[in-house]
């Protein structure tokens, strides 16, 4: 893990013998922080939380197209910032907004499901959106979520709401749907949480394709 280069003057003792420390990883060269429970995270993950509101993540490349498959796959690609909130990094009232846009094609009457996740935990998901026949059309998705309570599973609570719109170029109209959910059973703020947004088609038809060319995550409270 590398040598300890900087540490708190009065290290915090914990029952398992760990202490709060900041160090440079000898392999990756990344500045990291070890908390009093022994959890190790990149230091920037903690800094993002401590600095409060503002930009958290900005995608800098198109995501891999989800095409001709019924597998649930991510709409997110690489970027700058972080999608991680470290263990015990949330506070009650923390609120975020995610804005995504991209290009989509679909076969008439095939459907699409959008899921908002933290790791493998589903925070919210849409009902199947039955698509019109479209080709290379613009879509937009906005997701808001707020931490209601913190703690372990069955104690922590998060509310998530999303709204997606797809432009039908031929008619100039939009198709869309909204969804909202509260997760107060499997959401856990005492562990690392990593945001993911996924899409899943109902069929493997080659006309079905979606990718993201813009994604920005912002902490608003």
Feature names for model-found ranges:
Residues 1, 24-46:
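Short, surface-exposed terminal/edge motifs of secreted or surface/virion proteins that either
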Residues 20, 34-36, 100:
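Generic hydrophobic/packing signal
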Residues 46-221:
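Surface-exposed molecular-recognition determinants
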């Amino acid at each position: 893990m590398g040598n300890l280069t900087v540490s708190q003057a009065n290290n915090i003792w914990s029952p398992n013998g760990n202490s709060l420390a900041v160090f440079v990883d000898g392999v990756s060269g990344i500045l990291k922080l070890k908390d009093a429970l022994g959890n190790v995270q990149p230091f920037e993950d903690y800094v993002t939380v401590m600095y409060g509101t503002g930009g958290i993540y900005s995608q800098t490349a198109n995501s891999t197209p989800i095409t001709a498959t019924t597998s649930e796959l991510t709409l997110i690609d690489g970027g700058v910032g972080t999608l991680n909130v470290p263990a015990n990094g949330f506070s009650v009232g923390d609120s975020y907004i995610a804005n995504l846009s991209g290009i989509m094609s679909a076969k008439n009457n095939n459907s699409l499901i959008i899921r908002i996740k933290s790791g493998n935990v589903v925070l919210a998901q849409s009902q199947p959106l039955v698509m019109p026949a479209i080709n290379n059309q613009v879509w937009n998705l906005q997701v808001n979520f707020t931490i209601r309570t913190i703690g372990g599973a069955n104690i922590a609570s998060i509310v998530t709401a999303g709204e997606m719109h797809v432009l039908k170029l031929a008619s100039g109209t939009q198709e869309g749907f909204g969804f909202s959910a509260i997760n107060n059973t499997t959401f856990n703020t005492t562990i690392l949480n990593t945001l993911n947004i996924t899409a899943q088609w109902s069929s493997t038809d080659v006309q079905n394709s979606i990718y993201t060319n813009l994604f920005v995550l912002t902490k608003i409270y």
